[in-house]
Amino acid sequence: MSKKVMSVVILAAGKGTRMCSNLPKVLHLLAGKPMVQHVINTANQLDCTRIHLVYGHGGALLKEKLNNEKLNWILQEEQWGTGHALQKAIPYFSEDENILVLYGDVPLIEVDTLNRLLLAKPHGGISLLTARVDNPRGYGRIIRKNDDISGIVECKEATEIQKKINEINTGIMAINSSDLKKWLKQLKNDNHQNEFYLTDIIKMAYQENRKIIGIQPAHLNEIEGINDGLQLARLERLFQKQQAEKLLLSGVRILDPARFDLRGQLICGSDVVIDTNVIIEGEVTLGDRVQIRTGCLLKNCRIGDDSQINAYTVIEGSFLDKNCVVGPFARLRPGSELSEKVHVGNFVEIKKSSLGQGSKAGHLSYLGDAEIGSGVNIGAGTITCNYDGVNKHKTQIGDYVFVGSHTQFIAPVTVGDHATIGAGTTVTLNVPENELGLSRVKQKNIQGWKRPKKT
């Protein structure tokens, strides 16, 4: 293809009735992102000047979910076929530019395949992505004469002989805008669906002796569309398998690729081990020799070298330095920072707090809006009472503080270095360094007391 300005058109106006959902089809999630987002991301990797999105059902929600994208939004109020969708885009095409047609429900198309398609486009002709499949049911068939592509017949219009053809149309094509405009204006809807088929322009091109080149995808799953929940689930597993295989080949040890979900971007150091049923969301970085045990959810976090995340731990928006141990059943909420060799045990929740080097919170604690120094021991059942019903307040604990079990810090409050907090204390006043803070009620023993008996 000669070097010309190129625009991408993504068709995404379908209602997706077979999804049995009020959500627009192209907003259903694949690997944590709307399926149309995958197509947009792919288009953004091409040498294109503009991306047009033809939308219809659920337009307001589409714009809300894709508000960060630089798109030209084109409304198709009535869905009268793929040809009709492209007709709506005609006013936005520049003269003599190349147009690449993509589909919002075909999310796994690869950049390399599209680049091959664009390079193969002949001058004055069309390059068309086709595929040979074992079961062509539901797809339009490629019609050839003397091995040249002469047309496409939609499945519902095909004869019994044509239905035996196993070369299918994917709908993805590259075409010059001037030719596309001309042929779109000639489309008719005299077919079983009363729709304007984009595929009819292939016959028009052939009748004008234009060259039509068929290109095959590198992998068949690239051209699979999503029309129902079953197809979505199938492509989800295919995509997750692909991602797991790439990580395995890079040296990451994933114990069971079939039970691994990556819904974002994962960067791993060497000798990382990921157990079963781990979910990665957003941008996650794992250092060297990190171990992630079964059932963990990691989202937008960084975990330092030689750290271990034990089973069923949730970490979001947090930073962990080297040699940390977290979990099982722990939760690190956004804004949490753990320095080297910090231990956070089972049923500990940390929110917007920092723990200094070597500090430990072993079990059953809530630490919110806290700044905790190095070498601190947090006893079981410790709570920072950070909320007064209106505002959040901070708890500051110095280095080498010992906090006894079942302690409550009524923030704002400060505890100095090397202080000790007795078990069961409610801390309402600042505790100076090296002092013992204690608010325990004096114990009283009642002699001769007997338990009541059942009557």
Swiss-Prot record:
Region (Linker): 230-250
Subunit structure: Homotrimer.
InterPro entries referenced in this protein's UniProt entry, alphabetically: Bifunctional_GlmU, GlmU-like, GlmU_C_LbH, Hexapep, MobA-like_NTP_Trfase, Nucleotide-diphossugar_trans, Trimer_LpxA-like_sf
UniProt: Mg(2+) binding residues: D105, N227
Enzyme Commission numbers on file: 2.7.7.23, 2.3.1.157
Keyword set includes Cell wall biogenesis/degradation: yes
Functional description taken from the UniProt entry: Catalyzes the last two sequential reactions in the de novo biosynthetic pathway for UDP-N-acetylglucosamine (UDP-GlcNAc). The C-terminal domain catalyzes the transfer of acetyl group from acetyl coenzyme A to glucosamine-1-phosphate (GlcN-1-P) to produce N-acetylglucosamine-1-phosphate (GlcNAc-1-P), which is converted into UDP-GlcNAc by the transfer of uridine 5-monophosphate (from uridine 5-triphosphate), a reaction catalyzed by the N-terminal domain.
Disulfide-bond pairs as recorded: none
Highest taxon above the source species: Bacteria
Keyword Oxidoreductase: no
GO biological process: cell morphogenesis; cell wall organization; lipid A biosynthetic process; peptidoglycan biosynthetic process; regulation of cell shape; UDP-N-acetylglucosamine biosynthetic process
Required co-factors: Mg(2+)
Gene Ontology, cellular component aspect: cytoplasm; membrane
Binding residues annotated for acetyl-CoA, in chain numbering: A380, N386, Y387, S405, A423, R440
Entry similarity comment: In the N-terminal section; belongs to the N-acetylglucosamine-1-phosphate uridyltransferase family.
Pyrophosphorylase as annotated region, ranges: 1-229
Region (N-acetyltransferase): 251-455
Top EC class, one word: transferase
MF terms in GO: glucosamine-1-phosphate N-acetyltransferase activity; magnesium ion binding; UDP-N-acetylglucosamine diphosphorylase activity
Catalytic residues, chain numbering: H363
CDD domains: GT2_GlmU_N_bac, LbH_GlmU_C
Subcellular location(s) per record: Cytoplasm
Protein name as annotated: Bifunctional protein GlmU
Catalytic activity: alpha-D-glucosamine 1-phosphate + acetyl-CoA = N-acetyl-alpha-D-glucosamine 1-phosphate + CoA + H(+); N-acetyl-alpha-D-glucosamine 1-phosphate + UTP + H(+) = UDP-N-acetyl-alpha-D-glucosamine + diphosphate
